Amino acid sequence: MEKKWIAILGSPRRGKNTEGLMDYYIKELEKRGRKVDKVILSEIEQNSCNGCEYCIRNNTCHHKDEISSIIDKIKDVEGIILGSPSYNYNVTSYMKIFLDRLFSLFDFGNGSWSSQLDSKGIKSIVIGVCAGPDSLSMGFTIEAMKRVMMDHGVEILIEESYFGTKRNPVDRNEEIRSEIMRKFDEVFLS
């Protein structure tokens, strides 16, 4: 059976730091025999959650857009890559819409909740990128993506925080590829 991953890019800026870093991770996954589909959130039809709670009653979102089909695909993947630059200390609005829509994967009943992704063994790589010099500049970007993944029972394999893109853009950083390869070796060989 083919091992599939899905990469969700929250940056509207094509070919820049977040996508460059994500592409390095995609190449490493492909080297290890994984098929990776990349979704550019800024280029697809998406509707934001309006809090109607249709999903609580029906186990699916009432919106029928490209986000809905991506959510259906997520149920059958080995792993998910989430990548977003930090916009005002948080994920982009594109990523926020996507994360909010994942709420439709929760099952509510008997006074508790669980995720349709629980016990599927799905893994994730979470990537945050910012121009600022340190983790304070990143704000909640990584945490926002991690929390949603963890609530769905998705294991975080790698958490990548990349700072200082103004002085050290991804495409000029010679060391980042070898660092990513090292992280993959630690995770995939252990």
Residue ranges and their predicted role:
Residues 110-155:
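Short, glycine-/small-residue-rich phosphate/pyrophosphate-handling segment
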Residues 8, 126-129, 160:
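Short beta-strands and strand-loop turn motifs
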Residues 1-84, 88-107, 157-158, 167-190:
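N-terminal beta1-alpha1-beta2 submodule of the flavodoxin-like/Rossmannoid cofactor-binding fold
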Residues 164:
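Active-site rim beta-loop-alpha module in soluble metabolic enzymes
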